[in-house]
Amino acid sequence: MLVQLGAAVAVLAVTAGVGPTGRFDVPVNGFAAATTVLREGSPESVGLDPAPIEAAKATIAGSPLFPGAVTLLAHDGVIVDRTATGKAVRYADATTELPAEQQVPMRVDTIFDVASVTKLFTSIAVLGLVEDGKVDIEKPVSTYLPEFGVNGKATITVKHLLTHTSGLEPFIPLWRDYPDKAARIKAVMDHAPSAPPGSVYTYSDLNLITLGVLVERQRGESLDSVVTKRITTPLGLTDTGYNPPASKRDRIAATEYQTTPARGMVRGEVHDENAWSLGGVAGHAGVFSTAEDLAVLGQTILNGGTYRGKRILREATVREMLTNHNAAYPGNAHGLGFELDQRWYMGGLAGPRTAGHTGFTGTSLVLDPASRSIAVLLTNRVHPVRTNGSINSAREALASGLARALAVRPRQGPTAWYTATGGATLLTGPLRSTGPVSVSFAAFVDTDAGDSLVVEFEDGGEWRALPLRVSGPGAPEQEVSGLSGSGHRSWWTVHAIGPVGAPVTVRWRYVTDSRYSGRGVTLDRITVTDSRRILLDGEKQPHLIRPLGWGPKTR
């Protein structure tokens, strides 16, 4: 049976929580209405700012890391943008570009090998077994696959596999070292873990290969048949499945030109060598899909497991998929199938409830229950070779573009100061005080853990940080030297005490590293006082504040 819900998912217990459309600063609890069906619309129709979306699309269109891409963004049940850019097929081999007339343009309905996004389909199939009473995730895998319980794996549970805490290593070259499918599956069943079960987080294809076998054994039919009957057909995902038919080849994006094994330019067959050696159907890879089909899957999850009247999972099961079961492994939050709160590809949408997955071929799906938003990025980044480099910057850019399109309303008045740029400063002029200076302001902070907003005063030509006292949902309980964090999606009230002396100059500085970013920082209600008077009222005297990298925003 499913594990008991913890306090971490209590916020999802209320179905169809109501919140204003287009807002980042008013997180929504519960699932979307079960009747929500994706429809076409504009960003403006659901209260989004189109400018950050266009900026993100420009970043992706200009990326040298992949020949082409399809993006899809949805909010509150509305597809606000879908765009195709570049080429679905550009190369004849590892280095030779096709003549221009032979290259295949990307289309919004191009079909992609989604690689490890397949793991979500397998996880849903496993949880269907749980709902049917055929599997208990707390029981050893060997309960259902007796041959698995050898070589130190007797205590590995189904939950360990779903959360990548089994101790199994990431990968073994089944396609190279074993002669046929039966031998390859046996190799997985026989393989010894590299760490004790439950002692470490290690993302492993072997976990999901095993779960695929478990699904087949318990259902008495092939994994692709189970996925078709229980997921893609009910949801109407007509372009999603394994081993796509030849009739759809013209719409399929090419992946890699492979020489070992000697497969040539791979198009319409799974790119992953192990999945290919297993007949194209495996628990870890093999699914092909489109941006729209993945968006429908995402909306199904946001709806609590149902779409167009077809339920594929119960709400309680979906809550478990969106619950962090890996609290013991900071930075590796994971539900039952979904990754959670991964800034490196979820960007400004990242938060404790944000769910998603990526694929090696250059794919990603991000679901943000707090704003009921979806970001899909599908690329052919391994075309023509897998050494093209990481596309995480593009993944992050798309998700952050959607996050920045969502509004954060000023705390007071028509505008607030906003930045998403590292090194940005807000600077007051010299303020003449007669005693200790008190600085207060409202801050909306959504940053990577390594980034922070600091408040400083000038002291003899040097800048010194002021200690900050913060209040509000999710605010630090102790005095801090800088503001950082994400997931709370709420305004904080901040106070600091400055030095005695005149004149005093105060600055707010957003300090970032070179890794990942959040939605950014918004400041409002800036006030500087001494014991006798108001030295600066930012609402009435914005001309006394000099912005460098900040700008006034209405949202």
Language model feature labels by segment:
Residues 1-23:
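Secretory targeting and sorting signals
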Residues 70-73, 81-82, 113, 160-162, ...:
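Structural recognition of the beta-strand scaffold that forms the well-ordered cores
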Residues 136-152, 233-235:
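Short, glycine/proline-biased beta-turn/loop segments that scaffold the active-site neighborhood
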